[in-house]
Amino acid sequence: MAAAKQRKPHVSRNPELVRGIGKYSRSKMYHKRGLWAIKAKNGGVFPKHAPKSADSKAVEKPPKFYPADDVKKPLINKRKPKPTKLRASITPGTVLIILAGRFKGKRVVFLKQLSSGLLLVTGPFKVNGVPLRRVNQAYVIATSTKVDISGVNVEKFDDKYFGKKAEKKNKKGEGEFFEAEKKEVNVLPQEKKDDQKAVDVALLKAIEGVPELKAYLGARFSLKAGMKPHELVF
């Protein structure tokens, strides 16, 4: 920031002899400052500048009726959704290591980034049991291993594909209230099973073409005694 300009102290042209008493009289200073010349130019009157006109603001009329109860006005939401930036180390086909959750330590293949910012990954399921699922990029480690996924079609997969259908809960009657609740088992639709098989078939063709890649994806990642995570090269 630029340094603030220091204002110079005002120095009077009439030096003080004693505090409050100047060297020159009032009439002497009138001629010394040349005020007589300013008056002469303006017909014997000091010039006056017209005051600046204030900006005309629209007058807001007060409300005719005041509400009985004070109601807080909701704040305007000015937040604009921004697409989540993908890490430079994560590209389509990169093998990732999941760090948390049900499949912690599993190696998966990254397929694409969804509109929500989550990553679409799969094991594939036939190799290590990880199905098509969404993962936050904060909970994965990107490795230097790549898989060719040019033959995999992932256009139909989006966030709606993984959404759960909202089911309305029916109110229980008096007789059903005392009955033991039966837990409903969620059955995976056949359509999703077929989608998983189609992705697995395309991925396995690319994986089997690289030696030891299938065994690498099937092995679970773990740290042993003496291993330093910050010194590992993935």
UniProtKB/Swiss-Prot annotation:
Q: State the UniProt keywords alphabetically.
A: Ribonucleoprotein, Ribosomal protein
Single annotated GO MF: structural constituent of ribosome
Q: Does the keyword Ribonucleoprotein apply?
A: yes
The terms describing its cellular component in GO are: cytosolic large ribosomal subunit
One short Pfam name that applies is Ribosomal_L6e
> One of this protein's GO BP terms?
cytoplasmic translation
Q: Which family does it belong to?
A: Belongs to the eukaryotic ribosomal protein eL6 family.
Q: What is this protein called?
A: Large ribosomal subunit protein eL6
Q: Which organism is this entry from? A: Mesembryanthemum crystallinum
Tell me what gene encodes this: RPL6
